[in-house]
Amino acid sequence: MPGKPVLHYFDGRGRMEPIRWLLAAAGVEFEENFLKTRDDLARLRSDGSLMFEQVPMVEIDGMKLVQTKAILNYIATKYNLYGKDMKERALIDMYAEGVADLELMVLYYPYMPPGEKEASLAKIKDKARNRYFPAYEKVLKSHGQDYLVGNKLSRADVSLVELLYHVEEMDPGIVDNFPLLKALRTRVSNLPTVKKFLQPGSQRKPFDDEKCVESAKKIFS
């Protein structure tokens, strides 16, 4: 019987948070090995665990997987969150990559110099309000179904709902003008596995505060 997946990263959101969300949505329990020092990262590098000397890394099914997209695609395939055919998978990839583009801006925001944060936040809000959220609202309106692809939960829905939560932390109410996105967020949030993940005390990480940023810098810089 294989053990639980083990996630290797620091104790913050970063590039691991979408993986945590997807595993949680799939109802998969996982363990975390938090890097606390540069030496912790060096040990993973020296023992050959990191193909490109980078985290996140996930131990699952006897493999040590790196590269966020590869990890997400494996989990999505394994737990039937990746569509029923090539066409659906292409759409899921397209929607998920759009999410990743904006999520990357959100991810970098806490790590930016103080003098650049105001402009960065304004850019995130503008891109969310005028480019990304309208695009996903249009998709949901075009087919009138509950989920983005195939009327079934996929990794694209999970990543989009995660993004909605993260952007709303920065600008409460930004989703209010997108009723179908709000409905999707409610629908996904009420799934038992996700509802559990959204409760206090879960493995979901809070916004990267100054302490988290300093910890990450000590490990990776």
Swiss-Prot record:
A Pfam family hit = GST_N
EC number(s) on file: 2.5.1.18
Gene Ontology molecular-function annotations: glutathione transferase activity
List every position bearing N6-succinyllysine. Answer: 4
Q: What is its main location?
A: cytoplasm
Q: Which GO terms describe its cellular component?
A: cytosol; mitochondrion
Q: Which GO terms describe its biological process?
A: glutathione metabolic process; response to bacterium; response to stilbenoid; xenobiotic metabolic process
Positions that bind glutathione: 9, 45, 54-55, 67-68
Tell where it localizes: Cytoplasm
What task does this protein carry out? Conjugation of reduced glutathione to a wide number of exogenous and endogenous hydrophobic electrophiles. Has substantial activity toward aflatoxin B1-8,9-epoxide.
- The family this protein is said to belong to: Belongs to the GST superfamily. Alpha family.
UniProt-recorded name of the protein: Glutathione S-transferase alpha-5
The organism is: Rattus norvegicus (Rat)
